[in-house]
Amino acid sequence: AQQLLADCAMALGGQPLRCVVNNASQFEPDTAATAQAQGLQAHWQTNTATPLLLGNGLLAWAQQHPSPAPGWFSVLHILDQKVHNLNPDYFSYTVSKLALERSVALQAQALAPWVRVCGISPGLMFLSGPQTQDNFDRASRVNLLQAPIDPAQVAASAVFVAETAALNGCTLPVDNGQHLVPLGRDVMFAIETTLHGAGAQEPPL
């Protein structure tokens, strides 16, 4: 982690490194009934362990580079609105993101007072897995605003959290209210049923 952070600092060309955004995710289909050890471990490594270790790396960095003000350094874990709105699809992915979401407050307590830790849980922004464009166009409106989520607003929210020192140990949904629209399946599968009926085949996985 320290070498990666040093490389990031060098890439910034002299600008101070103050925030790590953990956005990488593994997203493979399975259910609780079909999950295998290899898939569970792979999702855990990418979606949970690596973000937490990078946060610990920023702690060591912050302790070596005095900040101009309290709360200056921060770690942002990019989650998923699904952690607030569960369904049984993409089980290994969901479990790994739930673990990371539960870790936000714990890591914030452990890294204080040097580093703040927050989560951001966006909704559907891009084509997901085997999703078709028609399916996405409909699924992206399954939220309280009935409108697609603008990725630029998610990015702006990350900047806001990084610059607001009073925010710590919390998770901010940025999803047009998608987490308040419960579904029994992943939104892609729910829309597929709407388009083609209850007997429709799911998109190939």
Map each language-model feature to its residues.
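Conserved mid-core segment of classical short-chain dehydrogenase/reductases
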Residues: 19, 25-43, 64-71, 89-92, ...
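Rossmann-fold scaffold of SDR-type NAD(P)-dependent oxidoreductases
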Residues: 15-25, 47, 77, 118-122
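Catalytic loop of short-chain dehydrogenase/reductase
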Residues: 49, 63-112, 124, 178
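Conserved Rossmann-fold SDR core element
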Residues: 101, 111-125, 167-174
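Amphipathic alpha-helical dimer-interface segment in Rossmann-like NAD(P)H-dependent oxidoreductases
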Residues: 9-13, 46-70, 108-109, 113, ...
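Catalytic Tyr-x(3-8)-Lys segment
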Residues: 135-153
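C-terminal substrate-recognition "lid" of short-chain dehydrogenase/reductases
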Residues: 148, 152-174, 179-180, 185-186
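Catalytic Tyr-X3-Lys loop
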Residues: 26, 33-53, 76, 93, ...
